[in-house]
A protein has these predicted regions:
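Transmembrane beta-barrel architecture of outer-membrane proteins
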Residues: 1, 20, 38-42, 93-100, ...
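Transmembrane beta-barrel wall of Gram-negative outer-membrane proteins
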Residues: 1-22, 26, 30-69, 96-102, ...
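Transmembrane beta-strands of outer-membrane beta-barrel pores
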Residues: 19-23, 63-67, 109, 120-124, ...
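Short sequence motifs at beta-strands and strand-loop junctions characteristic
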Residues: 35-39, 51, 93-97, 159-163, ...
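Face-selective signature of the C-terminal outer-membrane beta-barrel domain
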Residues: 97-124, 153-292, 319-321, 383, ...
């Protein structure tokens, strides 16, 4: 439901509320839980105040809440009849609460428009899920005979609280400087704080329960959420969770923060009615700090990574006529570095702990990614604007490309860097209105990519195939 209210000639608002509630259309046959259900509440209000003929202020807020059992993700070897039914030994849960408040102020200065944008957002998520996606111990008939051995694994819970503040101010020209230069200048700031917790349990001895208990400094996890009441072990006291005697896996408490600011500017030089030269630059300073406490003190790190970079773009556009344009561009791009939640032990640390010695492949921090991009193309409209064709060719050269990597040490993986790689290709797009009832949408692309430098990484498929059943 929505309502628009014009309070006066200068003040108006629009408010919307949406409620969704439905039973699940999938079922966990082991515990009877309905999955793919929905219990959502959404609220948004948007207010516009005309301060004067040349200035305005817009303020908006949004709230969203979800309290569901979670999605039905059926294991690959789950033989439960009916694609909407599965057998898993976890009572899953998905909860999300999101709040957003923002404002936009616009002020016409005559020669330019000044715009200020600010926002605050807070998201809280809480998830309980079955990580092995099967039920080999409690319902072996639901798992195919050809399946590999599955140890019971679940996250109970995985939670995160994320709070982000942003502010941006920019100025956009209303009329070309000296009659030929359009321009924009601005600055951006972001501050983000995250608190994350993960509790993973493993049925390592394959007896159907997570043996033992221990005190959790952060969670009073409800063991009754894990299994039907008939399977609950007795004697659990408040503040204790299962997982002693080796039946707990990845445990993490992490507190990353990010602070980023940048300044930027761009101008378009109108050389003639047909030719334009576009040039822009941006300077970014990005700092990540993270306190990581994994395995309740087994791996502790105070991590920090600062990335600074100046990027830019130079482009040429030439109108072949009223309906066609050719262009070329040279662009420098940048993705800041950061810190990892988990990372490998050094060879010295492996030796001191009596582990098999292997070089670390995932490090506490990772480097910034940068790209040098070249592109040429043509954009054309035909048949009185009823047909549009875009064709482009491109070449990208990456330094320190970021990718998701796995470390030889167990429970450790994160982002690593490929020192050098290249990507090139071409793409074409045709969109047309053939008749009042029929449209055409055609897209095609060819792509060739290559890693141009040597680096060490772990083949996950080969590594996993060497893990024996207990």
């Amino acid at each position: 439901a929505s309502i628009n209210i014009p309070f006066s000639d200068s003040l108006a608002s629009r408010t919307s509320v949406s409620l969704t509630s439905r039973d699940g259309f999938s079922q966990n046959v082991f515990n009877g839980q309905e999955l793919d259900d929905a219990d959502h509440t959404s609220f948004r209000t948007d207010w516009l105040l005309e301060l004067s003929d040349t200035s305005s202020l817009r303020v908006f807020g949004q709230y969203f809440d979800a309290d569901n059992n979670g999605a039905a993700i059926k294991g690959f070897y789950d033989t439960t009849p009916d694609r909407r039914k599965l057998s898993q030994n976890t009572l899953s849960k998905y909860q999300l609460e999101s709040k957003i408040v923002g404002g936009i102020g616009e002020f016409d200065l005559g020669y330019a428009t000044l715009k200020a944008l600010a926002s605050w957002q807070k998201d809280e998520i809480y998830v309980v899920r079955d990580n092995d996606r099967h039920n080999l111990f409690h319902d072996p008939s639901s798992v195919a005979a050809t399946a590999p051995f599955y140890v019971g694994v679940e996250f109970n819970p995985e939670s995160q609280i994320q709070e982000t503040n942003t502010f941006e101010i920019n100025m956009i020209s209303n009329e070309p400087f000296n009659g030929v230069f359009d321009w924009i200048i601005g600055a951006f700031y972001m501050d983000q704080e995250i608190e994350g917790h993960i509790r993973e349990f493993l049925d390592d001895n394959f007896n159907g329960v997570y043996d033992g208990t221990f005190a959790d400094p952060y969670f009073d996890t409800s063991y009754s959420n894990m299994f039907p009441a008939s399977m609950l072990p007795a004697g659990l006291s408040p503040g204790q969770i299962p997982g002693g005697a080796g039946d707990w896996g990845f445990m993490s408490d992490n507190y990353p923060t990010r602070e980023s600011y940048s300044v930027y500017g761009q101008t378009t030089f109108n050389v003639s009615d047909a030719l334009r030269i576009i040039a822009g630059a941006r300077y970014t300073d990005d700092t990540v700090e993270s306190y990581v406490n994994n395995f309740f003190g087994g791996q502790i790190g105070n991590l920090e990574k600062t990335s600074t970079k100046t990027t830019g773009r130079l482009a040429f556009e030439y109108d072949l006529g009223l309906n066609s344009m050719i262009y070329s561009s040279f662009t420098l791009g940048f993705k800041p570095g950061g810190s990892n939640l988990t990372y490998g032990y050094t060879e010295a640390e492996d030796a001191s702990m009596g582990n098999a010695i292997a070089p670390p492949l995932v490090f506490p921090t990772f480097e910034s990614e940068s790209v040098t991009a070249y592109e040429v193309g043509i954009k054309s409209d035909f048949i009185d604007g009823r047909m549009r064709a875009n064709v482009a060719a491109f070449f990208y050269q990456y330094d320190d490309l970021q990718f998701q990597a796995t470390d030889p040490d167990v429970f450790r993986g994160g982002v690593a860097n490929i020192p050098g790689s290249e990507m090139k290709g071409a793409e074409a797009e045709i969109i047309g209105i053939l008749t009042d009832e029929l449209t055409l949408d055609f897209k095609a692309a060819i792509l060739d990519s290559e890693v141009t430098t040597d680096f060490e990484t772990l083949d996950n498929v080969k590594a996993n195939s060497t893990i024996p059943a207990p």
